[in-house]
């Protein structure tokens, strides 16, 4: 990932304390599986995951638990633009608007799905319902990486969002937070970010979910 760095704002391309970072990721995933899946999806929820994962790990406190923005008081995130390969994330001037629209859409999609298959249902989902659950997980993941709201750690939070959907509807967290899943996942994430096409990610989640039950 490339980014525009300001004077006094350290580049965030590596993590300090890999063992500590792994412990933090596991705590966040455990928290999601234990209680967070019952909460409505929101910017504050995802910010709290990011903060718990990266507090003391990111090279500058401005980067932790805050979205890129044009008018932030956090100097290092003002006008902060990201590019993954040759694909730019959402312009910093539009990040907050797109994040707000994302969670509005996410909650609407979740409510529609729960109207036919409520989370916590005692019956198993039909094949069509499983397909809809996976579509929602892939959509949430793909839209998050398309926006790329954070300075770094967007893929990890996208995988947490996909796992959030799966766990909410009775499945296990099929997407590893770190290391990143295999190359088909990378290709699918790129298609989501560049083209808004989440169909490849749907196929990846189907496979990872099936493998998690072997």
List each model region and its residues:
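FIC/Doc superfamily catalytic core
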Residues: 1-214
